[in-house]
Amino acid sequence: NAHTAVPACEPSRCALMSGRRPWVSGCYKNGHEWRKYQKPGEGLSAQFLKAGYYVSGAGKIYHQMDALEEEWSDYMDKGKLSSNGPGVDKYDGYHIEKTFPHLKDEDIVDWHSVDYCVERLSKKRKKPYFIACGLYKPHLAFVAPRKYYKDFPLDEIKLPPHIENDLDDVPPPGIKMAGPQADHAKFLKSGRWKAAIQSYLATCAYTDMNVGRLLDAFEKSPDRKNTIIVFWSDHGWSLGEKQHWRKFALWEETTRIPMIWVA
């Protein structure tokens, strides 16, 4: 029953990597400013580096796949790889993001992040090593190759528990947090609530596949018997419970996270 320090990408990751709670560091929001709250040399990877480890990283460890280069032995350059696959992105100064259909596994940056880490897991090293592999999905946008949708037929999708008056006993700040007139109102109007859940599950399945690739590489690793695995996420997700979507709330759906240790 693990819960994040704060249900938002940037402050949650800053808390984990710095070991400092948001109310200590001051990092509460997404704003691409986590460097203001975490000094160079304070991060988790920096601690491993100081302890003599070889430290590799790929993907979304900090917010927006950012990293402090001096805190890593090597870190994957994502180049022009996209978290959502090829599409229309920031055309002529405008942020108009639309993903092209018929994606392949390798069209999404997570595939390449796993490739990067798999290659490093295969090497026998003279010094201990730490590898951080940050998978972007199932973050928005909910896009994945179509084959991952087949296990989630639209007519079998079940909506989460919900009642129309669920916010009647919630004070104004809580209603503002839920935002029933934002995402939820749009899904009710469009009739695509189940389609959104289906797409979310498909991105989860895509991530499950990539985690499997990492575990397969771990099984073949020369250091398999002397390796600790930690599986963690930065926040939970709401899919319409209490008329709320996304994270940014203090209900269990948004704060609860997976936390698995294998040693």
What do these predicted regions represent?
Residues 1-263:
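Formylglycine-dependent sulfatase
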